[in-house]
A protein has these predicted regions:
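A solvent-exposed, acidic/Ser-Thr-rich amphipathic alpha-helical stretch
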Residues: 29-77
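Residue-level signal for the nucleotide or nucleotide-sugar donor/cofactor binding architecture
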Residues: 3, 18, 46
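Short, well-ordered alpha-helical segments enriched in acidic and aromatic residues
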Residues: 18-34
C-alpha cells in the first residue's frame, strides 16, 4: 500500500512547525536528494547528513528563524508525492525570502528515500550574496 495525502501532510508538519528533526526522522540516512539549480544550495546529496549540511545548516546561518516552510498543496500517487511548499522568511539583512518550491518525493515503506527539489535559484543566490557565510 502506498502513502496517503494525510500521511505526507503529517510528515511535513515538522517543517511547518520549525521542527526539522521531526521531519528528518522520516528521511532515510542514505537518501538521494537533488536540489536543482545554479545557486549555493544546489547539488546532489547522497545522505541525510550531507543534505542537511549542504542546505539547512547554511540556511540557518542567514535565516535566523529558519526557512519557515509551509505546504501549499500536494499530489500523491502510490509511493510518490509532489509537494508544493512556500517559504516566507526574513534574512539577517532584512531581505524577505519569499520562495516557492516543488519537491518530488519518493517513499519506501513510509520513509523518504529520494527527492528532487525545484526552487527559485535567483532568490537563493540573492539571499547568499546579501548575507555571506563563512
Amino acid at each position: 500500500m502506498g502513502i496517503t495525502s494525510d500521511s505526507v501532510r503529517e510528515i511535513f508538519k515538522g517543517l511547518e512547525n520549525g521542527d526539522g528533526a521531526a521531519f528528518f526522522e522520516h528521511v532515510a540516512d542514505n537518501v538521494d536528494w537533488i536540489v536543482e539549480g545554479t545557486h549555493p544550495l544546489a547539488g546532489h546529496y547522497l545522505s541525510k547528513k550531507a543534505f542537511i549540511e549542504g542546505t539547512f545548516a547554511k540556511l540557518s546561518q542567514v535565516l535566523p528563524n529558519g526557512a519557515q516552510l509551509h505546504v501549499e498543496d500536494l499530489l500523491v500517487k502510490d509511493n510518490e508525492a509532489v509537494v508544493e511548499l512556500h517559504s516566507l522568511a526574513t534574512a539577517k539583512n532584512g531581505l524577505r525570502f519569499d520562495n516557492r518550491y516543488c519537491w518530488v518525493v519518493y517513499f519506501l515503506d513510509g520513509v523518504i528515500v529520494r527527492v528532487r527539489a525545484y526552487l527559485d535559484s535567483a532568490m537563493v543566490a540573492r539571499l547568499f550574496e546579501e548575507n555571506p557565510i563563512a
